[in-house]
């Protein structure tokens, strides 16, 4: 992916600070997302719960909000339910449980960073990202 700085600048944290990715980070994140996440999250939709997508609006309404890079990294390490009440580490793939999710065993910290970063860039690349699922 060859993207401009505006497209590659994403929100870093809850304080609203931003970070600008490299095209290489976005490309690597996309590859890893496709390889590891699209089984349930094709185009940012959620196969197991059509009411919650990976669109920025839905991520912002999660508890805690997941619409920034550090919050998404936290989710990929320690997933919780949308309302933040339940630990989903045994139900949702994550890097903290390689005993349950061996397919994620070899992901590095940089890989997790790039996947989370791609999830924040993706809505700018595909207007259908996180959209409605039609049957």
From Swiss-Prot:
This is Photosystem II extrinsic protein V. The keyword Membrane applies. Gene3D superfamilies: Cytochrome c-like domain (1.10.760.10). The gene is psbV. Keywords: Electron transport, Heme, Iron, Membrane, Metal-binding, Photosynthesis, Photosystem II, Thylakoid, Transport. SUPFAM superfamilies: Cytochrome c. It comes from Microcystis aeruginosa. One of the extrinsic, lumenal subunits of photosystem II (PSII). PSII is a light-driven water plastoquinone oxidoreductase, using light energy to abstract electrons from H(2)O, generating a proton gradient subsequently used for ATP formation. The extrinsic proteins stabilize the structure of photosystem II oxygen-evolving complex (OEC), the ion environment of oxygen evolution and protect the OEC against heat-induced inactivation. Low-potential cytochrome c that plays a role in the OEC of PSII. GO terms for biological process: photosynthesis, light reaction; respiratory electron transport chain. Heme c binds at residues 37, 40-41, 92. Binds 1 heme c group covalently per subunit. It is found in: Cellular thylakoid membrane.
